[in-house]
């Protein structure tokens, strides 16, 4: 072989080697893309369905946790809350009636649980209060009767009143005489004066009159 033939063979072998290298790199890139495509597509789908959260584990590797359907759940919760608030007039009336019926039923149950002795005790207490009021009324009537019929020892009411009038004339006799000597003093004026003195005596009970007269006697 000549030198030209050898150089031509070398050029061909170099070209073949270059083609083999290109095929290998193409195969490697295609295998990488094929192996990475499913994961990327699945990640895209999972990202569309929910949010990706990255957590670092104990071995230092990052794990991806997918929380699916958060937005959809929130939308459902919001829809439920709105539907709970938005009630029609008829539904609100029915709700009020039902609650009232429940309260009435609970009240009936509570009343039915009251023992019978409690009811009888209340009845006895009412009867006792009425009896006490009646006894107070009777005692008051008896007291008024005793006060009206009370007579001091050795003296009656008329005599006590006369003694009290004499006591008044002794102390205020000059004033009474001046009134009687006035030019406008008449028999009518005399009766008015007598009535006034009698009413003054009525301000005291028998015991008080007796005490006043007794003190006056002790002074003399």
From Swiss-Prot:
Keywords: Nucleus, Phosphoprotein, Ribonucleoprotein, Ribosome biogenesis. Residues 73-91 have a biased composition (Acidic residues). Associates with nucleolar pre-ribosomal particles. Interacts with DBP6. Together with DBP6, NOP8, URB1 and URB2, forms an RNA-independent complex, which is required during early maturation of nascent 60S ribosomal subunits. The modification Phosphoserine is found at residues 83, 99. Required for efficient biogenesis of the 60S ribosomal subunit. Residues 13-24 have a biased composition (Basic residues). InterPro entries: Ribosome_Assembly_3 (IPR051898), Rsa3_C (IPR028217). The modification Phosphothreonine is found at residue 88. Belongs to the RSA3 family. GO terms for cellular component: nucleolus; nucleus; preribosome, large subunit precursor. This is Ribosome assembly protein 3. The lineage of its organism: Eukaryota, Fungi, Dikarya, Ascomycota, Saccharomycotina. Pfam families: Rsa3. GO terms for biological process: ribosomal large subunit assembly; ribosomal large subunit biogenesis. Present with 2940 molecules/cell in log phase SD medium. Its main location: nucleus. Residues 41-72 have a biased composition (Basic and acidic residues). The keyword Ion transport does not apply. It is found in: Nucleus, Nucleolus. It comes from the Eukaryota. Residues 29-39 have a biased composition (Low complexity). Residues 1-91 are annotated as: Disordered.
């Amino acid at each position: 072989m000549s030198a030209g033939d050898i150089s031509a063979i070398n050029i061909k072998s170099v070209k073949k080697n270059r083609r083999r290298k290109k095929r290998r790199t193409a195969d490697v890139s295609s295998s990488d893309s094929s192996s990475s495509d499913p994961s990327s597509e699945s990640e895209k789908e999972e990202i569309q369905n929910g949010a990706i959260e990255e957590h670092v584990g104990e071995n230092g590797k990052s794990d991806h946790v997918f929380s699916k359907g958060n937005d959809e759940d929130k939308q459902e919760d919001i829809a439920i809350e709105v539907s709970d608030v938005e009630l029609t007039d008829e539904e609100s009336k029915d709700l009020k009636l039902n609650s009232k019926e429940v309260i009435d039923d609970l009240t009936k149950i509570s009343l039915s649980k009251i023992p019978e002795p409690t009811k009888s005790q209340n009845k006895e207490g009412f009867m006792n209060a009425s009896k006490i009021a009646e006894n107070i009324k009777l005692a008051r009537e008896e007291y008024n009767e005793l006060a009206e019929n009370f007579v001091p020892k050795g003296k009656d009411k008329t005599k006590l009143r006369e003694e009290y009038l004499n006591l008044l004339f002794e102390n205020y006799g000059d004033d009474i005489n001046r009134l009687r000597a006035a030019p406008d003093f008449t028999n009518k004026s005399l009766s008015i004066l007598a009535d006034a003195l009698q009413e003054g005596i009525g301000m005291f009970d028998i015991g008080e009159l007796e005490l006043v007269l007794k003190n006056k006697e002790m002074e003399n």
